[in-house]
């Protein structure tokens, strides 16, 4: 927020003076890439200070959008998540290429009070989290579609693990299950209404077409136009892939 008595013109003139000073300093060290990168990052931060406040102001969204996302109903946690979903769409409209949203990320000490980590009280906790997430998430996808943005936007809904099919401890919660859980993809390049893979009858382990996180990442990278076998990063003396050596694109989910 701009301080009282400090106008937009003052802000612009200050930025112009700073840019000239930085440019003069950079001319003295023409080969200093770190200095150039730091100046560029400050300039980007300055541009964000000018454009971000307007973009984050959701009061100019029509009532129909607020109703669609549910910013005015339910718990405060749901309202905030719904606002973040609208903000995600606005960021995409401005050309931001990657937007990440979190749901149920509040710490709980393992009791699942404000997140999905329900080692106890799973019935009430998951009901609360589902109420927070369902309407805004569905509204975001529908909104992207109605604006013609879903054709070139990939929506990835993912988690790190699921829950065991049996109760634990005091009988009201369930432990982590890394062997069977659900993620979904929507939008650009993905089949509509298609499911891939199944678990056993208990929901304990993936049984048909098990998918690793490397396969999942390879598929996402493919949909983003990146070859996961050629995209490498130097780490500990080796060129490493994000998909390790055994990740494969899941062809069956591609449109």
Segments predicted by a language model, with ranges:
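Ligand-binding pockets and gating/stacking loops
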Residues: 1-255
């Amino acid at each position: 927020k701009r301080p009282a008595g400090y106008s937009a013109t003052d802000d612009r003139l200050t930025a112009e003076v700073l840019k000239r000073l930085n440019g003069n300093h950079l001319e003295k060290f023409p080969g200093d890439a770190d200095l150039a990168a730091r100046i560029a990052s400050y300039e980007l931060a300055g541009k964000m200070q000018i454009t971000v406040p307007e973009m984050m102001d959701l009061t100019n969204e029509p009532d129909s959008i607020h109703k669609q996302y549910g910013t005015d109903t339910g718990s405060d946690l749901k309202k905030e998540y719904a606002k973040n979903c609208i903000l995600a769409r606005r960021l995409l409209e401005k050309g931001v290429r990657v937007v990440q949203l979190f749901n149920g990320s509040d710490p709980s000490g393992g009791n699942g009070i404000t997140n999905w980590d329900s080692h106890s009280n799973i019935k009430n906790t998951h009901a609360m989290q589902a109420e927070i997430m369902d309407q805004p998430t569905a509204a975001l996808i529908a909104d992207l579609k109605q604006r013609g943005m879903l054709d070139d936007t990939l929506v990835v809904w993912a988690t790190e693990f699921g829950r065991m099919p049996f109760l634990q401890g005091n009988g009201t919660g369930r432990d982590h299950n890394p062997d069977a859980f659900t993620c979904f993809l929507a939008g650009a390049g993905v089949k509509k209404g298609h499911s891939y893979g199944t678990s056993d009858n208990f929901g304990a382990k993936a049984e048909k077409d098990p998918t690793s996180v490397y396969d999942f990442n390879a598929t996402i990278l493919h949909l983003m136009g990146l070859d996961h076998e050629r995209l490498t990063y130097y780490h500990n003396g080796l060129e490493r892939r994000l998909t390790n050596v055994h990740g494969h694109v899941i062809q069956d989910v591609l449109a």
